[in-house]
Amino acid sequence: KEKVKSVPIVGGTKTPNLEKIRQINPDLIIANREENRKEHIEELQKDFEVIVTEIGTIEEALFEIHEIGKKCGVSESAEKLIFDIQQELNCVPDVKPLTAAYLIWRKPWMSVGHDTYIHSVMQHWKLNNVYNERLRYPTITLEALSLKKPDLILLSSEPYPFKEKHIAEVSKICSGSDIMLVNGEWFSWYGSRMLPAFRQLNAVRRTIGL
């Protein structure tokens, strides 16, 4: 935190201050196709080098670490990080697969489809997404979810901050499933956060579905 205190704030992902970015005159801008608006990216591309990431799988996330490391002249550090992450990927516990739903929002209830990074993480840790046939972040109902009878329902800490009280709310309708609060960072943050996230997932997965 101390290292980034002096880094200027240039707005939000949907509301960047383009003039402030121009004043900083960055060597490289890293954008995300889902988080940033197309018109902002195109405007910045007129004056700066912009890497536009679109990450839907663990493999794509590792590739972007490689690419950004190369662009920033820190390939050795990037490759070391990739190696360490791959070590964790190779340490998935030998546990039985479970069917699972991962909820990200309430009112309306929303889950994740097969073309998301979250889905990729779930699959790697043997949590078979019951919304595998859906795209992106589908709106669902708890009544329909209960008919799918997932072994496990995961309530993420973000973007909706699910709490203990929501377990009771979901269990009233999905009484046949185990319901668990999870740290959203484990499933949805990529880049350098993958390493601590995957360590936690390996530890937690050993305790689920025993």
Model feature map: region roles:
Residues 1-210:
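N-terminal ligand-binding lobe of clamshell/alpha-beta domains
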